[in-house]
Amino acid sequence: VVAEISGNHEGELAKALKLVDAAASAGADAVKMQLYRPGDLTADVPTWKVRGGPWDGATLWQLYERAQTPVEWMPELFAAARARGLVPFASVFAPWAVEALEKLDAPAYKIASLELGERALIACAAHTGKLVLMSTGRATLGTVNDAVESCGPTPHVLLHCVASYPAPLEQTHLRTLTHLRTLFGDPVGLSDHGCKPSAVCAAIALGARVWEAHLMLPRPNRALDAGHSLEPEEFKEMVAIIRECEASLGVSRFGLGDLPAERDTDSFCRRVVYAADLPDGHVLRPRDTVRLRAPEGWPADVPLPLGRTLAHGVPAFAPIQLEDFR
């Protein structure tokens, strides 16, 4: 479970640290930042504006300038995360970010959906030998394949993602997880912009082993990604649901399990008993037996002692036993 801080710190280190603390309290395993400078992504051109969505009308430069997490914050954020038992890492958008995070011994790197075509960046992150997580929103299958090739032998996780903020449930297309597993193997995961419990449970059932979602401080606030983020209590509830889903998967098994309640159903199993009163000296025939739910009787999957002679009379519905025969 990865809690994504993104730009929800509103440009304040104190809020970023509160988000780290909230991630730990909510039960996340890891917390993720984003490390870039606006110039890594765009240029300060007044006509380069966002069209539609929650940031409609802002220039790209304005958006990324507001959302950035300064590199100077990273040592304190990483230390705070580790102190709370979280795994800290970040999305990177340029090689310098990888170099900066290597100095903090970052255990993993994330490649955002819109950077999946940046093969040199992926190779730079993969060259560290650390785990590389890659979101696939908007990416064609060819782009995903190229990204995986760019990782080489470095361990990686593909995160199915819908590049909509938020992502409608009916457009989540979780069967993509099965496709990714078939083509590229495990593990896979979900970078979630919809945050619906039903979708998360379905993703886990389909093989997702990583779930990432945006975390924000309690409303009201001016969090940049508020439209597709969870408050701490909402995130905590989702983590609880995820843990239940994980527990319910169990293993593939058949037959009787270890639960006492399962063993209590033993008396309901079908067994073979005598179908009628039978006298001493009777030779047992198939029609003399019947399979019924009974607490005692001849095991239904064991061949009957047909043709054997009774050593004594037996009543109807008595359990068939070897000692009944000569």
Model-derived features: positions:
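Catalytic cores and adjacent flexible loops of soluble metabolic enzymes
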Residues: 1-326
